[in-house]
Amino acid sequence: MASNNDPTVISMIERHLCDLPETNTSDLKTLTEEAVLSFHNISYQETVQSGFPLRKKAYVIERLSNISGIMKPGLNAIMGPQDGSRSLLLDVLAARRDPRGLSGDILINGKPRPANFKCTSGYVPQNDVVLGTVTVRDNLEFSAALRLPVTITRDEKRRRINEVLELLHLNKEQNIKPRSKELRKRTSIAMELVTEHPILFLDDPTTGLDLRTTTDVILVLRRMSKKGRTIIFSINQPQYSIFKFFDSLTLVASGKVMFHGPAQDALEYFRSAGYNYESHNNPADFFLDVINGGFSNILDTEEDGHEDDKYEELFERQYQVTGKLANMYAQSPLYSETRAILDQLLGEQKLERSSAVETTCVTPFCHQLKWIICQSFKNFKGFPWVTVIQAIITVILATAVGTAFRVLKNDCIEVQMRAGLLYLLTIFQCITSVSAGELFVIDRVRFLHEHTSGYYRVSSYFFGKLLAELIPRRLLPSTVFSLITYVIAGVKMSMKCFFTMICTIMVLAYSASSLPLSIGAGENAVAVPTLLVTIYFVFMLFFSGLSLYSGSFLPKLSWIQYFSIPHYGFRALLHNEFLGQNFCPEHNTEEVSRCHNYVICTGEEFLMIQGIDLSSWGFWENHLALVCTMIILLTITYVQLLQVKNIRNF
């Protein structure tokens, strides 16, 4: 078994960190030695608002209060009741919270955390963000490709992946898609180990797992800690078979420390304070009972036999108990010993504060874009039946619509029906684009985690998703539908007009998809952008339909057309189809008689009734409007993504 000072382990970390940009010699030494994380008098405050929307009041709440401790290589557990303190402490140590509310010092081997500490340490969130539509190896290759510098050879990356697969006993499952909770958890850990960072944070890694799977995960973490890694994780009431593997234990409640030290000394610490521990009791349950005020002790002898019947009294009792336990720990010899070590580590570092909020990437934009597109296409292939069903429905619907309009003839009485077909094409592009709002919503948590961990920049993710998701799922179905309908219906058969129509359909589809994207990028639920976009398109399509029969918008509502995406697309399709058409052939006396009292005989007449300019600009102005609308909406989408990444860090 490798020791904590194993030169092989340190050399592997050095090879990786030498390739990191903006990493100086001091940072290299800090991160390649046995990583000892110390935190000194840290407090964390959050500002919350309450009240009515226009009369909200802001309150500052102290979530962590004057916490100090040290985490050495090994298994460092953070336990506590369900009040959010343990996960908050973990996130603060991992630099995954807004640093503006943080006070105190957090050091690595006695030096301030690097500004890009989030990118030079591993973090496994409580809710797994593994892509379940690709294999375990594909997930690891994605992590290695984006988090390791391009200067590292492909063979070296493959070697690291194979080592991690063997370490976590994933060799047999490497070509399986991670669907089970246990496999997803191990895959999440493996993705962090590929980078060989010396510190790994895990937020409740055993949540939702059975005892056997929990034991397997903890044993995996223990094997990693024996390699010299510092494993820091939060956990809730583990069994003794799990607890016995812990090297360090930190008990927190109400934002205060109840105990911090060797895990095996915790029972003796509370025994010496007067708490009676029964041999058959689980240590983790015993600690939480003490924190929750469930045990009488020498500090509470005057309250023996008292029954708390009300919730408020129970809450007040717990608050008093945690306060007493925190004071007891602050006056204990254990804290004095820890304080002496912390003071020695701190030295003069109080003058060198680091915000630890910078996110750096070790790969260039094009490299990130390529891998995001490849991963998106693999994800796309992971839903084959969805693709097949969508294709079948598109073909059937297009064939039905084309057949229904197959009766179109080049005469005057078919003008409105021809325009109705183009209106139906416009409706299809708009309605099918509504679901585009889910593109950035369903991957929101994964995006936050991967971006914060240094996988890619926001720009790479943005353009990669647009190219890999919208083209196969939005543009191709729209193009296929329009192509089949156009050919079967037998409208204006000209190569120039055909390709112009396809170009118009693509621009319209992308512009229509940009609207739900701009709304969905800032939302947590798919229902919100779907509802808003549906209302918008129904409203705008209604007015576009009125213009088909009345010739123009209602005078008092004419301004609406300037904000209507369907309006611009429909007008462009009309211009392309009707310009140069003659619906009253002079050599067909039967059709001439049918057109005797009919007003419209040429396509130009119909376009003029619709208020469409007959010049080339009358066509291209609609394209320009659609492109400008698309650019504005996609810009809003990008800004939304930039804002989202700053709201909550993962």
From Swiss-Prot:
SUPFAM superfamilies: P-loop containing nucleoside triphosphate hydrolases. It is found in: Membrane. Residues 37-279 form the ABC transporter domain. Keywords: Membrane, Transmembrane, Transmembrane helix, Transport. Pfam families: ABC2_membrane, ABC2_membrane_7, ABC_tran. Residues 381-644 form the ABC transmembrane type-2 domain. One of its GO terms (cellular component) is membrane. Residues 409-420, 491-498, 549-623 are extracellular. Highest levels of expression in thymus and spleen. Detected in lung and small intestine. InterPro entries: ABC2_TM (IPR013525), ABC_transporter-like_ATP-bd (IPR003439), ABCG_dom (IPR043926), ABCG_transporters (IPR050352), P-loop_NTPase (IPR027417). One of its GO terms (molecular function) is ATP hydrolysis activity. The chain crosses the membrane at residues 388-408, 421-441, 470-490, 499-519, 528-548, 624-644. Residues 1-387, 442-469, 520-527, 645-648 are cytoplasmic. It is a multi-pass membrane protein. May dimerize with another subunit to form a functional transporter. Belongs to the ABC transporter superfamily. ABCG family. Eye pigment precursor importer (TC 3.A.1.204) subfamily. This is ATP-binding cassette sub-family G member 3. It comes from Mus musculus. The gene is Abcg3.
